[in-house]
């Protein structure tokens, strides 16, 4: 079933890059997990990239995130499963994660943002 908050289809390779970046940023302690923390990081201008799971139920939990990201000019990307996203940040599942600092992964970050920009055209 198509989720109303999924605004574009993210290719598998881009989703995997996003998961790799989340895992790396988590190891350096520079992420926010949980929708409330993610929203705060976006509103404070701290977020570099938001990763949103496509299988969130109820969808209202993350429904507002894509619009907020667009308003605040924060790139965002989707991954298929919240369990995959959660496993990268040490919890069972995560509806969304905000990367506050991507550390030494600038090239990976730029490749994700570039791919997302192309998808939204």
Curated annotation (Swiss-Prot):
<keyword id="KW-0687">Ribonucleoprotein</keyword>
<dbReference type="InterPro" id="IPR004038">
    <property type="entry name" value="Ribosomal_eL8/eL30/eS12/Gad45"/>
</dbReference>
<keyword id="KW-0963">Cytoplasm</keyword>
<protein>
    <recommendedName>
        <fullName>Large ribosomal subunit protein eL8</fullName>
    </recommendedName>
</protein>
<keyword id="KW-0819">tRNA processing</keyword>
<dbReference type="InterPro" id="IPR029064">
    <property type="entry name" value="Ribosomal_eL30-like_sf"/>
</dbReference>
<keyword id="KW-0689">Ribosomal protein</keyword>
<dbReference type="GO" id="GO:0042254">
    <property type="term" value="P:ribosome biogenesis"/>
</dbReference>
<comment type="subunit">
    <text>Part of the 50S ribosomal subunit. Probably part of the RNase P complex.</text>
</comment>
<dbReference type="GO" id="GO:0005737">
    <property type="term" value="C:cytoplasm"/>
</dbReference>
<comment type="similarity">
    <text>Belongs to the eukaryotic ribosomal protein eL8 family.</text>
</comment>
<dbReference type="InterPro" id="IPR004037">
    <property type="entry name" value="Ribosomal_eL8-like_CS"/>
</dbReference>
<dbReference type="GO" id="GO:0004526">
    <property type="term" value="F:ribonuclease P activity"/>
</dbReference>
<dbReference type="GO" id="GO:0003735">
    <property type="term" value="F:structural constituent of ribosome"/>
</dbReference>
<keyword id="KW-0694">RNA-binding</keyword>
<dbReference type="GO" id="GO:1990904">
    <property type="term" value="C:ribonucleoprotein complex"/>
</dbReference>
<comment type="function">
    <text>Multifunctional RNA-binding protein that recognizes the K-turn motif in ribosomal RNA, the RNA component of RNase P, box H/ACA, box C/D and box C'/D' sRNAs.</text>
</comment>
<dbReference type="InterPro" id="IPR018492">
    <property type="entry name" value="Ribosomal_eL8/Nhp2"/>
</dbReference>
<dbReference type="GO" id="GO:0006412">
    <property type="term" value="P:translation"/>
</dbReference>
<dbReference type="InterPro" id="IPR050257">
    <property type="entry name" value="eL8/uL1-like"/>
</dbReference>
<dbReference type="GO" id="GO:0005840">
    <property type="term" value="C:ribosome"/>
</dbReference>
<dbReference type="GO" id="GO:0019843">
    <property type="term" value="F:rRNA binding"/>
</dbReference>
<dbReference type="InterPro" id="IPR022481">
    <property type="entry name" value="Ribosomal_eL8_arc"/>
</dbReference>
<dbReference type="Pfam" id="PF01248">
    <property type="entry name" value="Ribosomal_L7Ae"/>
</dbReference>
<dbReference type="GO" id="GO:0001682">
    <property type="term" value="P:tRNA 5'-leader removal"/>
</dbReference>
<keyword id="KW-0699">rRNA-binding</keyword>
């Amino acid at each position: 079933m198509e989720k109303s908050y999924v605004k574009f289809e993210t290719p598998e390779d881009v989703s995997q890059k996003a998961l790799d970046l989340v895992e790396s940023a988590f190891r350096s302690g520079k992420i926010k997990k949980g929708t409330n923390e993610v929203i705060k990081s976006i509103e404070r201008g701290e977020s570099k990239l938001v990763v949103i799971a496509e299988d969130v139920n109820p969808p209202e939990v993350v429904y507002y995130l894509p619009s907020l990201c667009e308003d605040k000019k924060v790139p965002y990307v989707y991954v298929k499963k919240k369990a995959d996203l959660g496993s990268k940040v040490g919890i069972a599942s995560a509806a969304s994660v905000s990367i506050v600092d991507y550390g030494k992964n600038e090239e990976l970050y730029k490749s994700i943002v570039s791919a997302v920009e192309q998808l939204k055209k």
